[in-house]
A protein has these predicted regions:
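Alpha-helical structural elements of signaling/regulatory helical domains
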Residues: 23-27, 48, 70-73
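Extended, charged alpha-helical "arm/stalk" segments used for dimerization and assembly
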Residues: 1-42
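Walker B catalytic acidic pair
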Residues: 185-187
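Generic alpha-helical segment signature
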Residues: 7, 32, 49, 53-56
Length: 230
């Protein structure tokens, strides 16, 4: 499940959706990951080259800044959408909030604060021969009525809110010439009858929706069957 799984799953959710909206974001991620690999190789050296380590750290800080800004903007924009979708699917006015936790807060002194954070983590990095902080270790969380849903939410609540979160980016497409195509893989089996009906009703807002399922029947939908051949 999204909120009970690895933080990497949640970072992937951010990165995939931001890359679709902003191609330059993918460029920043690619540059950051390249420098991260280089820094980790330096840390694994028998004799660490301090100048190379310093240079790679400065580059990580440089590329991390725009990534943090994009992630923070995305989470802020998606929060109200997440609330509306969750309430539509559940029919209950729960208090929902998505939170992004950057490795360092953006401010006018971002570069200085980020470099200081890397300096504080240096002993740990050298000991484990890997970069222990940065945008590659960040996470997002969702709270339901003030409590972390991954920790305190029921299995049903986790499934519904995760589904609502996955649907939210489709509502961020404001260009009328771009009609989003919604693709949902085997989500119906995780929902009870009432919530399946609510979801199907909700999905009729979209021009095209593809749902994979082994036995789902939807009025007015075109069914494409795939069979396994011997």
């Amino acid at each position: 499940m999204l909120f009970r799984g690895s933080p990497k799953e949640r970072r992937n959710f951010l990165d995939i959706n931001l890359s679709k909206q902003f191609p330059i974001y993918l460029d920043y991620i690619s540059r950051y990951e390249k420098v991260l690999r280089q820094r980790n190789e330096i840390l694994k050296s028998e004799k660490v080259d301090q100048k190379l380590l310093e240079a790679s750290t400065e580059l990580l800080v440089k590329y991390a800044g725009p990534i943090i800004n994009y992630r923070a903007m995305f989470v802020k924009d998606i929060n109200d959408i997440l609330i509306k979708i969750t309430r539509t699917l559940t029919g209950v006015k729960e208090k929902i909030e998505i939170t992004y936790r950057p490795f360092v807060n953006m401010s006018s002194d971002y570069q200085k604060e980020a470099l200081e954070a890397f300096k504080r983590s240096l002993d740990n990095d050298l000991r484990h021969k890997a970069t222990s902080i940065g945008i590659h270790r960040e996470d997002i969380s969702v709270s339901l009525n003030g409590k972390d849903i991954g920790t305190f939410g029921s299995q049903g609540e986790n499934r519904l809110v995760a589904l609502a979160l996955k649907l939210s980016p489709y509502f961020m497409i404001t260009d009328e010439d771009k009609k989003p195509i919604v693709v949902l893989d085997d989500v119906m089996s995780e929902l009870d009858k009432d919530h399946r009906e609510q979801l199907i009703k909700f999905l009729r807002k979209f021009a095209q929706v593809f749902i994979t399922d082994t036995k789902l029947e939807i009025d007015g939908a075109t069914r494409i069957e795939l069979t396994k051949s011997n």
